[in-house]
């Protein structure tokens, strides 16, 4: 469900540039994401998608331009403030990045123990609820991550991200490495997360089926080496259905190459 038209901005990029030495990754990138919006950031490898996510949570700063969280620049904030800001985000990594020495339950509880003073019985209740939400049975809680399939590890990562009740969910290639059936399970969970709580959802992905299933808006970045010096790096900003029928051949080729008939089915439901 799209947010209200007058929903306040939660994240803003204003003429953002990012260099690594002499290599420019982002050039003059501007967009606004409103509270409660669900947005996919797509594009070929090397176009700056992951850098964009890192800028959102203050893991790096723009070379020029500004990134705003709730209307205030992220750059220049103290480490203490950045730590508080990052607790507002839930991050689902491309690889689950679980602690192999800890049980599933302790992985999900990790952020709660590090960042809250909740008693253990309340932490245990939250862990149980989050595992239930992502469709994992109680028996999984005592297992180690190495005992789980890739799809189950993804679900544990999602449960951990949800444990601290984030305002903004960031998904970095959430279906990479999964078969179509498990990809559909993860896509459905992303939808359920949005349905159950007021949350802003940002998905970085190559999977256009995920785009068609889980978001209302698509932003496409294009690799700078293949753009003219005066061309904008954002070459598309619209709905998934509009992306599928976009007249720009660069958008059309990417979208159809990634999803084909499956995206058409999703976009025209």
For each of these PLM feature ranges, what is it?
Residues 74-90, 114, 120, 243-246:
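ABC ATPase NBD coupling module
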Residues 102-110:
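Short coil-to-helix segment of the ABC ATPase nucleotide-binding domain corresponding to the Q-loop/switch region
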Residues 144-148, 152:
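Conserved ABC ATPase signature
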Residues 73, 120-139:
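Conserved ABC ATPase "signature" region
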Residues 165:
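Conserved catalytic motifs of ABC-family nucleotide-binding domains
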Residues 57:
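Helix-to-loop junction immediately C-terminal to a conserved catalytic motif
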């Amino acid at each position: 469900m799209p947010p209200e038209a007058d929903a306040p901005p939660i994240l803003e990029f204003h003429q953002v540039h990012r260099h690594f030495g002499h290599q420019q990754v982002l050039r003059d990138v501007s967009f606004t994401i409103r509270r409660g919006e669900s947005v996919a950031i797509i594009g070929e490898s090397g176009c700056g998608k992951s850098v964009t996510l890192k800028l959102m949570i203050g893991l790096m700063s723009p070379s020029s331009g500004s990134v705003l969280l709730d209307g205030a620049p992220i750059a220049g904030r103290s480490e203490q403030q950045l730590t508080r800001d990052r607790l507002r985000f839930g991050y689902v990594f491309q690889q689950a990045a679980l602690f192999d020495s800890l049980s599933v339950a302790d992985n999900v509880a990790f952020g709660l123990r590090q960042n809250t003073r909740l008693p253990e019985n309340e932490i245990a209740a939250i862990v149980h609820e989050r595992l239930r939400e992502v469709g994992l049975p109680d028996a999984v809680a005592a297992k180690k991550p190495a005992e789980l399939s890739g799809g189950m590890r993804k679900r544990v990562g999602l449960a951990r991200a949800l444990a601290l009740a984030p305002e903004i969910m960031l998904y970095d290639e959430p279906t990479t490495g999964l078969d179509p059936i498990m990809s559909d399970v993860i896509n459905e969970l992303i939808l359920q997360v949005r349905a159950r709580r007021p949350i802003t959802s940002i998905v970085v992905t190559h999977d256009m089926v995920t785009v068609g299933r889980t978001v209302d808006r698509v932003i496409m970045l294009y690799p700078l080496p293949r753009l003219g010096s005066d061309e904008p790096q954002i070459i598309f900003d619209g709905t998934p259905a509009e992306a599928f029928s976009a007249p720009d051949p660069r958008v059309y080729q990417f979208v159809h190459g990634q999803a084909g008939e499956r995206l058409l089915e999703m976009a025209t439901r």
